[in-house]
Amino acid sequence: MNRLCFFNKVVKVARGDSPPFDLASLPPKEQRDLIGETLFFMVEELEPQFAPKITGMILELDQDKVLHLLVTPKAFKEMVKEAMEVLAHSFLQQMKIARGKRC
């Protein structure tokens, strides 16, 4: 079990019995998977119901930006807040469209 530290907490990442690793030494897909797993647990603490969607939204960003968010609590929380605002706006737009089709 490897551990990554973000926000002064330890996130355990299942990676078999391998020794500690450097993220840059992993293939791109494994990097993305590991970052995604870590992000999911972090987002889940703030917005459990929308963690899968928000995690996906954040993973669409440039990897350097994502890594910055992982180690900057204030920026991370702001990004999750922005993602929730986007989701709320999208939901309202869909509701307006649905109402318009009923008339």
UniProtKB/Swiss-Prot annotation:
One of its GO terms (biological process) is regulation of translation. Residues 15-92 form the PABC domain. Pfam families: MLLE. InterPro entries: PABP-dom, PABP_HYD_C. Interacts with ERD15/CID1, CID7, CID8 and CID12. Encodes almost entirely the C-terminal domain of poly(A)-binding proteins (PABPs). Plays a role in normal seed development and growth. The MPC locus is imprinted. Only the maternal inherited allele is expressed in endosperm. This is Maternally expressed PAB C-terminal protein. It comes from Arabidopsis thaliana (Mouse-ear cress). The gene is MPC.
